[in-house]
Regions:
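Asp-based, Mg2+/Mn2+-dependent phosphohydrolase catalytic module
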Residues: 1-6, 118, 122-123, 127-218
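Short, surface-exposed acidic
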Residues: 27-40, 70-86, 214-218
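Active-site neighborhood of HAD-like aspartate-dependent phosphohydrolases
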Residues: 1-43, 188-189, 200-203
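A metal-dependent, Asp-based hydrolase signature
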Residues: 48-84
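Alpha-helical elements of Rossmann-like donor-binding domains used by nucleotide-donor carbohydrate transfer enzymes
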Residues: 18-22, 46, 60, 64, ...
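Hydrophobic alpha-helical core bundles mediating ligand binding, dimerization, or RNAP-core interactions
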Residues: 20-23, 61-66, 87-91, 125-130
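A short acidic, helix-capping loop that chelates divalent metal ions and anchors anionic groups
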Residues: 45-49, 125-128
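Short, acidic loop-to-helix structural element flanking the phosphoryl-transfer center
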Residues: 73-116, 156
Length: 218
């Protein structure tokens, strides 16, 4: 493998399911107010299951959750950007980004491997300033965010853009994403893939490092 290509939301950043306590704390909501748990407890989250069946988009899912949370604090029509800024924005990178992801990115770079991001909506959800100040942004060899484009995963063109930015062949890349539809899209384009399980981040990044031929501490 010559390059690691990562989705951002839920892969590099912790999912909002994992941030329920932080959201409740920052917004002064009672503990346990947020009951939808996505893949951690699918039976609690019919909307999540609808997304998994491709009945709604990921953007629609999170847009709904943002509006619901906004309504709990008396705000109407909150977007994901509104929500994330309300709980701390760029001030809480250490609570939002997965340490396993940051370590893996750093070790890849130390070993001369390329690292890129292929996302559908980083800036849409977090805001431009938040993206520009990501602590690892200058370590990336490629960055494609479809916030300002109509070319979204799993459109084959999205993967092709990332491959061109990385200047590698499809079989030289490991692509990691938490959404199965995006994994299928990558497979069709010839990329090696890992369907990221957000309930097992340690195991997933252990696998990533194994495939990339690197280890912690190198």
């Amino acid at each position: 493998m010559k390059a690691l290509l990562l989705d951002f939301g839920s892969v590099i950043s912790k999912s909002l399911f994992e941030r329920h306590e932080l959201i409740e704390e920052k917004l002064n909501l009672s503990k346990g107010t947020l009951t939808w748990k996505g893949p951690f407890a699918p039976e609690t989250d019919p909307l999540w299951m609808a997304m998994q069946r491709d009945e709604i988009t990921e953007r629609a899912y999170w847009g709904t959750r943002a509006r619901e949370i906004g309504a709990l604090v008396g705000e109407q029509n909150w977007s994901m950007t509104d929500l994330l800024q309300a709980i701390g924005g760029e001030r809480i990178y250490d609570k939002v980004l997965r340490p396993q992801a940051l370590k893996t990115i750093a070790i890849c770079k130390q070993n001369g491997l390329k690292v890129g991001i292929l996302s559908n909506e980083i800036e849409l959800f977090t805001g431009k300033e938040w993206v520009e100040n990501l602590p690892f942004i200058n370590d990336l060899d490629s960055f494609y965010d479809a916030t300002h484009s109509d070319i979204l995963k799993p459109d084959p063109r999205a993967y092709q853009i990332a491959l061109e930015q990385l200047n590698v062949l499809p079989n030289e890349v490991l692509f990691v994403d938490d959404q199965l539809r995006n994994i299928f899209g990558a497979i069709k384009c010839g990329l090696k893939t890992l369907h990221f399980d957000i309930t097992e981040p340690d195991a997933c990044f252990d696998y990533v490092r194994s495939v990339m031929g690197i280890e912690l501490g190198i």
